[in-house]
């Protein structure tokens, strides 16, 4: 497995791959000052290697890189994560230590389901979503391309729109539209992002 991006997020993915017995072949990063990460070589040009995981935490940058590379993508799922056999996980997605993904949940491409996050039954997680550590998505929640902050709770049957940023510790009790910054308990829209 190759990684694109040599930063802190890549270190966690390396740990996941090693714990899963998956060989890390190397990393690629645009920064010419980085030559290695955790003992693995870092190159600065992409020459078609695959499979790949984009090891960049920023959702929009992850999307831009995926659209630019157009290669085959793998997945990284830590052995301590609990996944229902009916859950679907898209290519390029990372599921970290202690995460739980329940029955009939559908997680899109290039997502991050971070440490201890809980994605309950029938949730639909769009491409490029980041569910931060210990966030809880109750049943039948829909999220599109957004960043869900650490410790956030979303009650059942709600939607968070595309490209939102939800602040840490928020409690979402009503639908959130596209392109907003929102946080609080209860979660409130602070401003529109686009």
Whereabouts are the PLM-identified features?
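Glycine-rich hexapeptide-repeat left-handed beta-helix
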Residues: 1, 115, 124-127, 132-194
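Hydrophobic, well-ordered beta-alpha structural blocks that scaffold small-molecule cofactor pockets
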Residues: 1-45, 93
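Short alpha-helical
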Residues: 8-11, 60-61, 171
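Short amphipathic alpha-helical segments
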Residues: 14-16, 64-68, 107, 177-178, ...
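Phosphate-bearing ligand-interacting subdomains
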Residues: 32-84
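Redox-cofactor binding/interface segments in oxidoreductases and associated redox assembly factors
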Residues: 52-55, 95, 183
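Hydrophobic, well-structured mid-protein blocks that either form specific transmembrane helices
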Residues: 70-122
């Amino acid at each position: 497995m190759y990684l694109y991006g040599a930063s802190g997020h890549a270190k966690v993915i390396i740990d996941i791959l090693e714990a899963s017995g998956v060989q890390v072949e190397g990393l690629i990063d645009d920064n010419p000052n980085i030559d290695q990460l955790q003992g693995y070589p870092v190159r600065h040009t992409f020459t078609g290697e695959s499979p790949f995981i984009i090891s960049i935490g920023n959702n929009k940058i992850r999307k831009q890189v995926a659209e630019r590379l157009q290669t085959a993508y793998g997945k990284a799922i830590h052995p301590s994560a609990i996944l229902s056999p009916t859950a679907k996980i898209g290519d390029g997605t990372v599921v970290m230590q202690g995460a739980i993904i329940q029955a009939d949940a559908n997680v899109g491409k290039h997502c991050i389901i971070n440490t201890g996050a809980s994605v309950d039954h029938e949730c639909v997680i769009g491409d490029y979503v980041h569910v931060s550590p210990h966030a809880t998505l109750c049943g039948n929640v829909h999220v599109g391309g957004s960043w869900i902050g650490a410790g956030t709770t979303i009650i059942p049957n709600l939607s968070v729109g595309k490209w939102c940023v939800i602040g840490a510790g928020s409690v979402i009790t009503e639908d959130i539209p596209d392109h907003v910054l929102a946080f609080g308990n209860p979660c409130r829209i602070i401003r529109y992002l686009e």
